[in-house]
A protein has these predicted regions:
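Conserved residues in the N-terminal Rossmann fold of short-chain dehydrogenase/reductase
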Residues: 14-15, 57, 224
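Short, conserved SAM-binding/catalytic segment
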Residues: 2-8
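Hydrophobic/aromatic anchor residues within beta-strands of the central parallel beta-sheet
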Residues: 13, 55, 78, 122-125
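Conserved sequence/active-site signature of Rossmann-fold short-chain dehydrogenase/reductase
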Residues: 19, 86, 130-132
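Conserved Rossmann-fold cofactor-binding substructure of NAD(P)-dependent oxidoreductases
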Residues: 12-35, 230
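Conserved Rossmann-fold NAD(P)-dependent oxidoreductase catalytic core, especially the SDR/UDP-sugar
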Residues: 32, 40-45, 49-102, 106, ...
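Residue-level signal for alpha-helix termini/capping positions
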Residues: 29, 71-72, 146, 177
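Strand-loop microenvironment adjacent to phosphate/nucleotide-handling motifs in alpha/beta enzyme folds
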Residues: 66, 106-271
């Protein structure tokens, strides 16, 4: 698909594991990237609740491995794609992503202050759910509607932030271009959406009606399954309410987040 759309752009797909020291060294040594967009992560909240070690291995140590190689091979910019679930996390996935954020920011500050040798600028971008991405609710709801229902929602009051894939990609790239190093960028997600309203709209867009107490002859029923392990009713984008500043881009803000000294953090993680 990429080569069809951009036939003149060289494209080299490389399969690898972000946890593998040897594989990451091979990739950085052979291709010498100028910019790294680090999006590799386990993001499924309930699965990570029952597999915490894997969440830490990939989301934390995988990030460390890629970031360290970026410094080693002189990458100009390293853009980490994070999540709103890293803010005041209540689940393993969110906590692992927050720890990855702290590592990236601490490494960036250590380089800036001359405590670590390197020139790489590290940036973190934090946003919510991406419509149509793997594991998102839209494809699942559509499949449930095609199968005649019911459409399953965890809680009637659960809300989430959403943006489209093109929006997310564009804002991440723009944030990477704006970075000075150590920045945590918050992407404007607009207003949060109630998941049950999203489900109802998808039913109606499919030319069907919702079956409920007000419409017993409707086509598709919506059922509530209960919050899953580690799941919040709502997500946040900021750890503190007053730590955000505007940037030159109307949809990108920067936040001042707490972090640990790099040496202290490295010692803890290596243990």
């Amino acid at each position: 698909e990429f080569t069809d759309k951009f036939p003149k752009t060289p494209f080299v797909p490389v399969i690898g594991d972000v946890r593998s020291l040897g594989r990451m060294d091979f990739v950085f040594r052979n291709y010498h990237p100028q910019v790294v967009f680090h999006a590799a992560a386990y993001k499924h909240v309930p699965l990570m609740e029952s597999n915490p070690c894997e969440a830490v291995r990939v989301n934390v140590f995988g990030t460390m491995n890629v970031a360290d190689h970026a410094v080693k091979y002189g990458v100009e910019r390293f853009v980490m794609v994070s999540t709103d679930k890293a803010v005041n996390p209540t689940n393993i996935m969110g906590a692992s992503k927050r720890l990855a954020e702290i590592y990236v920011q601490s490494l960036s500050v250590a380089i800036r202050d001359g405590l670590q040798v390197g020139t790489t600028r590290f940036i973190t971008t934090r946003f919510g759910n991406v419509l149509g991405s793997n594991g998102s609710v839209i494809p699942r709801f559509r499949e449930q509607i095609r199968n005649g229902g019911p459409v399953t929602v965890t809680h009637p009051d659960i809300i989430r932030y959403f943006m489209t894939i093109p929006e997310a990609a564009q804002l991440v790239i723009q944030a990477g271009a704006m970075a000075k190093g150590g920045d945590v960028f918050i992407l404007d997600m607009g207003e949060p959406v109630k998941i049950v309203d999203l489900a109802k709209n998808l039913v109606q867009l499919s030319g069907l009606s919702v079956k409920d107490e007000n419409n017993s002859k409707g086509d598709i029923e919506i059922t509530y399954t209960g919050l899953r392990p580690g799941e919040k009713l709502y997500e946040e984008l900021l750890i503190g309410g007053d730590n955000v500043r505007k940037t030159s881009h109307p949809r990108i803000m920067t936040a001042e987040e707490v972090y640990l000294p790099f040496e202290q953090l490295s010692d803890v993680l290596l243990e």
